[in-house]
């Protein structure tokens, strides 16, 4: 868990340039279109995957026009290319496991470009299944400790009663873990309790993390991760690394 939290902190500190915002819009638009097609409905109240994607779009101030266009691409009201979802697996420098969630209209092009990014940055794209066993798909909902509007014990009981699998305590936040299928139920129960959710998504969490205690190695890994995140077809990047605060501070 610590690996997820610390990496999330790094991402949040990165500058949000106009170019990056544009990339975020493109990726969320793909997620919305895919959610409509896979869920069989353009109605977010009848399609929990779409509901989550739209919530994520609004969280980054994506215009309603963009959201509606992405939904219509999913329903077929607007012509669009076929988008394929793929999982790629590989290794970053230091043997760190990497999982990539891909959304592409050209599998061969994407595979070639991702392989190139790995090989140029001291990593390698692996075979299917090479690192997937190190990760588990879960719902993850985080809430800052200083935003908690009730006693800790009451909070724990409420989220567990709502269907959460576990609640873990980090330095500055609580992380609520759910099964993917109960994620939206738990999230909505927390919202009804007026809990201010910091982050919420279905993610791939590592079963165990690897501490990176060398500054140069941490820099190499982060460089590759950021290049992968910036690729147009990469929706999400997950790793099993954990970088101590003092190493982050030295970067």
Curated annotation (Swiss-Prot):
Localization (cell): Cytoplasm
GO molecular function: DNA binding
GO cellular component, one term: cytosol
Region feature (Disordered): 1-23
SUPFAM superfamilies reported for this sequence: YebC-like (SSF75625)
Entry keyword annotation includes Secreted: no
Biological-process GO terms, alphabetical: regulation of DNA-templated transcription
Keywords: Cytoplasm, DNA-binding, Transcription, Transcription regulation
Domain of life of the native organism: Bacteria
Signal peptide: none
Alphabetized Pfam families for the sequence: TACO1_YebC_N, Transcrip_reg
Family statement: Belongs to the TACO1 family.
PANTHER family: TRANSCRIPTIONAL REGULATORY PROTEIN YEBC-RELATED, TRANSLATIONAL ACTIVATOR OF CYTOCHROME C OXIDASE 1
Name of the protein described by the UniProt record: Probable transcriptional regulatory protein Swol_1435
Organism of origin: Syntrophomonas wolfei subsp. wolfei (strain DSM 2245B / Goettingen)
